[in-house]
Amino acid sequence: MALSQVSASLAFSLPNSGALKLATITNPTSTCRVHVPQLAGIRSTFASGSPLLPLKLSMTRRGGNRAASVSIRSEQSTEGSSGLDIWLGRGAMVGFAVAITVEISTGKGLLENFGVASPLPTVALAVTALVGVLAAVFIFQSSSKN
């Protein structure tokens, strides 16, 4: 059984690279490790277990504290609707959440819970086409009313 060594790398720059001594191989018979005396304190964040970002971040703001005003305009309102579309949307969201919960809890797909073990391609295509056509019809009808 062969042992594999996992290593992480870290890119860094040295301000005084001319003072860097040549790297030496510590033990040539075992796995190859390079020892650089000047870099003994610098380790990768993965190997040392430290967070990827430094804990103390100093951020400087340019300019003063300017307040930016943002205006948001919505074209939709619930005042003119009958409320049916709102409740249908809420029902669809709750139904989707229930379906996902049932799939996670049972470990079976939605069709398997209804007794269909393998999906039927023609039925799936027909249902998809029907839903697509009905969605397009409802979208075009609602846009013609406005």
Swiss-Prot record:
Single GO MF annotation: chlorophyll binding
Subcellular location: Plastid, Chloroplast thylakoid membrane
Segments crossing the lipid bilayer: 84-104, 120-140
Keyword Transferase: no
Membrane topology annotation: Multi-pass membrane protein
GO biological process: cellular response to high light intensity; cellular response to UV-A; photosynthesis; response to high light intensity; response to wounding
Induction or repression: Present at low levels under low light conditions, but accumulates under high-intensity light. Induced by UV-A illumination. Fades out upon wounding.
Residue range of the transit peptide in the UniProt record, numbered on this chain: 1-73
UniProt keyword list: Chloroplast, Membrane, Photosynthesis, Photosystem II, Plastid, Thylakoid, Transit peptide, Transmembrane, Transmembrane helix
Superkingdom of origin organism: Eukaryota
Keyword Membrane: yes
GO annotation, cellular component aspect: chloroplast thylakoid membrane; photosystem II
Main localization of the protein described in the UniProt heading: plastid
Similarity comment text for this entry: Belongs to the ELIP/psbS family.
Function of the molecule: May be involved in non-photochemical quenching, a process that maintains the balance between dissipation and utilization of light energy to minimize generation of oxidizing molecules, thereby protecting the plant against photo-oxidative damage. May play a photoprotective role in the thylakoid membrane in response to light stress.
Protein name as it appears in the record: Stress enhanced protein 1, chloroplastic
Organism: Arabidopsis thaliana (Mouse-ear cress)
Taxonomic path: Eukaryota, Viridiplantae, Streptophyta, Embryophyta, Tracheophyta
Gene designation: SEP1
